[in-house]
Structures are given as C-alpha cells and as structure tokens.
Amino acid sequence: MRFRIYKRKVLILTLVVAACGFVLWSSNGRQRKNEALAPPLLDAEPARGAGGRGGDHPSVAVGIRRVSNVSAASLVPAVPQPEADNLTLRYRSLVYQLNFDQTLRNVDKAGTWAPRELVLVVQVHNRPEYLRLLLDSLRKAQGIDNVLVIFSHDFWSTEINQLIAGVNFCPVLQVFFPFSIQLYPNEFPGSDPRDCPRDLPKNAALKLGCINAEYPDSFGHYREAKFSQTKHHWWWKLHFVWERVKILRDYAGLILFLEEDHYLAPDFYHVFKKMWKLKQQECPECDVLSLGTYSASRSFYGMADKVDVKTWKSTEHNMGLALTRNAYQKLIECTDTFCTYDDYNWDWTLQYLTVSCLPKFWKVLVPQIPRIFHAGDCGMHHKKTCRPSTQSAQIESLLNNNKQYMFPETLTISEKFTVVAISPPRKNGGWGDIRDHELCKSYRRLQ
C-alpha cells in the first residue's frame, strides 16, 4: 500500500506540535519562577515562641520539623533534610530580593512620591498580637496618611505579612534583617551545634573544643543567639534605613524608631510636628526627640501641652526615639564601641556611647504626657503572661478619659533641666563573642 505524503499538512502539523510544546514549556517556567519567589508555606513555619538557647538547635530551627525519634538534648543535632536546606535558601533569596526591590505601597506615584518630616521604622519580631494593636493605634492617628512606615522584620511570618498587607492608610515599606536566626538556623549568627553551652566554664569549654570557647562574656557565659539578635537587628536597621533605603536617600527629616509592642496616641503626629518646630526654634542643641517615658499620669490636665529638655537616659527615653541624619552620623562613627560593648541591649549600649564615644551627653526633648505606650508587658525582659487585650484596654481608657486635653494648639518648654553627668551603665553581658562584634561592624560595609 502506498501512502501519499502531503508536505503542506506535515508542515502545519509540525507547527501545531511546536506551538503546544512552547505553551507547555512557558507554563512550567512561570510556575517554577513563581514557586521560587513565593513565600514559604504556612505549615513550614514554627510555632510562635519556639526559641532556643545556645546549641539547642531543634527548638530554634525554622522550617525544620523535628523527627519523632530525634532528642532535643542531643549534643549534635541530626543533619537537616535537603528540603529544609532548600527552604532556608528560599528564605534568604526572598529576603535579599525584597530588600533590593524595596516595593513601596499605598502611594500614587512611587517614582515621584517623597516622605515629609517624619518616617516611622518599626522593629518586628514574631508577636502578631501586639503588632495588631500598634497598627490599630496607627490607624487612629491623625495625619498618618502622610507618614511612611517602614517595617523591619527578623522573622518571616505569613500571619505578620498579612497584617501589614492590610495597612491601607499610609505608605508602607517592608525590609528584612538578612542575618536572622531563621535564615541561619544551624550556624552563626544562629545557634551552631558546635557552639559552647551558655553556662559551661571557660576551662571546660577549651577542653571540649567548642568553637567560641575563647569568648565568654563578662560574666563567664557564652552567647545565646535569641538574645544577640535584637541588638544586631537594631544596628543593621539603623544603618539600612539611613543609607540603603532609596526613597530616603535625600531625606532631611526625622526617623522615629518603634517596636512591635508599642502603642501610639491619636495625637502623636500632631504633637511630634510641634516638637520638631520647637526644637528648631528654641532647642537647637537638643540631640534627639522622644515621644515619652514609661510613667503616665492618670490626668493630662495642665501637662498635655508641656515638654521638657533633659539628659537622655536609656531606661526612660528609649521608646519612640527620633533621630536626625546628623544624630545618626555621629552614632555610626561609634560603630566599634557599639559593636564591642558587652551588653546585648541596644539601648543600654547607646547609653554607654553617650558617656564614652559621642561628643557630649545626649539632650532630649520629651513631652510631659507620653504619646507612646508600652503594650508589651511580657517579652525578653519579662516573665508575665502576655495579655495584649488587657494592656490595650487600659491604654485606651487612659486616652479616652483625657481626650479633651489632647491635640494642644501650642507646645511650650516647661523646664530645661541641667544636663548632668550620667555614670556608665552596668553592663549586662551577653555580647562577648567576637563573631557578634565583627558581624555588627560589617553592616557599614554592606551594599
């Protein structure tokens, strides 16, 4: 039997097959690209509060599920599964890409929009219940639609990202600390299984041969990654927002530093603008601004329109700390001192800088009635049960009972206290490891 071959039909059939193949290839390619950049799945995230100390890797590893027959007390944890390694690499790649892209949301024209006299930077870890309260307070703040809010994260969380995705009342930018425990679960700056246990004496550590045996802190303890991370994040964030955030390249205003468990009064921006004007006109020697102290009077009468000039103290004025670019540049010149001082608290370390490295003691302009409150009565320094709803209810009650005194028409400096010498604070330790020192100092060199 003879078959007649029609060249035209063969050509058409070939083109059809090629077209189908191209469509299939393109679809798979897009899928692979989307999978590569997509956020990690919810079930890959650890339970909140799963922290660990020292070399107890299984409790701090993010995205790695503990196998049932693996003991958390093992001196050398099991080798991570390849899927876990791939997940960690996806986190790192995603963080790098987002920090590079710096996608600005809630602005009409991203290429032409510029921030005004205030930018907020919020340090976020993994307490969505408190972050939700902060966002609620921001939503109620008058004039917030003109304020850029930068959220700086050290933990990738779908729940937290969804909370921030719901912010539609102000410009928003998210950045991510690229050296978090989550991104380095099995190695420094996370907890390396070869690290020395926290309470191991130095002579025993030297015999054991753990990798940081030479570098205990001032109290003989070895580093705990979960405590070191906060100071790292704060210093990286300080540098990154001033030097690497493109929208702030020519910014001449102030940056107000917050944390996820802070709560702002509805008139905080109103008061802040008046404080900034007062500083320029009546207190040019003031180095920094603060939105308030931890002590709040039950009545705002006679004080809501008053501010004081004082010597800055880390235990009183670390909430709502606002810096100019000039103040930042003086701080960054003290990088070596900040990064080697043996205290895991960023604010106590700043206090040490004011007496050891900065040209003079910091002078702070602060309102007599706080416009910022600490909702987080639990956390790193507290062992209380977290009750964010109780705390927010108390703050709301205080504000509602004094709303007639808020939004003052003018602010006046009630008193300029004499700037007194402050003794160097007693260091708390937790920052003796030379690896922490060198990583901290490297942030200035990062592009």
Swiss-Prot record:
Its main location: Golgi. Keywords: Congenital disorder of glycosylation, Disease variant, Disulfide bond, Glycoprotein, Glycosyltransferase, Golgi apparatus, Manganese, Membrane, Metal-binding, Signal-anchor, Transferase, Transmembrane, Transmembrane helix. The keyword Mitochondrion does not apply. Mn(2+) binds at residues 261, 374. It catalyses: an N(4)-{beta-D-GlcNAc-(1->2)-alpha-D-Man-(1->3)-[alpha-D-Man-(1->6)]-beta-D-Man-(1->4)-beta-D-GlcNAc-(1->4)-beta-D-GlcNAc}-L-asparaginyl-[protein] + UDP-N-acetyl-alpha-D-glucosamine = N(4)-{beta-D-GlcNAc-(1->2)-alpha-D-Man-(1->3)-[beta-D-GlcNAc-(1->2)-alpha-D-Man-(1->6)]-beta-D-Man-(1->4)-beta-D-GlcNAc-(1->4)-beta-D-GlcNAc}-L-asparaginyl-[protein] + UDP + H(+). Its cofactor is Mn(2+). The chain crosses the membrane at residues 10-29. Residues 30-447 are lumenal. GO terms for cellular component: Golgi apparatus; Golgi membrane; Golgi stack; membrane. The keyword Coiled coil does not apply. Changing residue 346 to A: Loss of catalytic activity. Residues 1-9 are cytoplasmic. It is a single-pass type II membrane protein. Gene3D superfamilies: Spore Coat Polysaccharide Biosynthesis Protein SpsA, Chain A. Changing residue 217 to A: Nearly abolishes catalytic activity. Changing residue 318 to A: Strongly decreased catalytic activity and affinity for UDP-GlcNAc. Glycans are attached at residues 69, 86. One of its GO terms (biological process) is protein N-linked glycosylation via asparagine. Homodimer. Belongs to the glycosyltransferase 16 (GT16) protein family. This is Alpha-1,6-mannosyl-glycoprotein 2-beta-N-acetylglucosaminyltransferase. It comes from Homo sapiens.
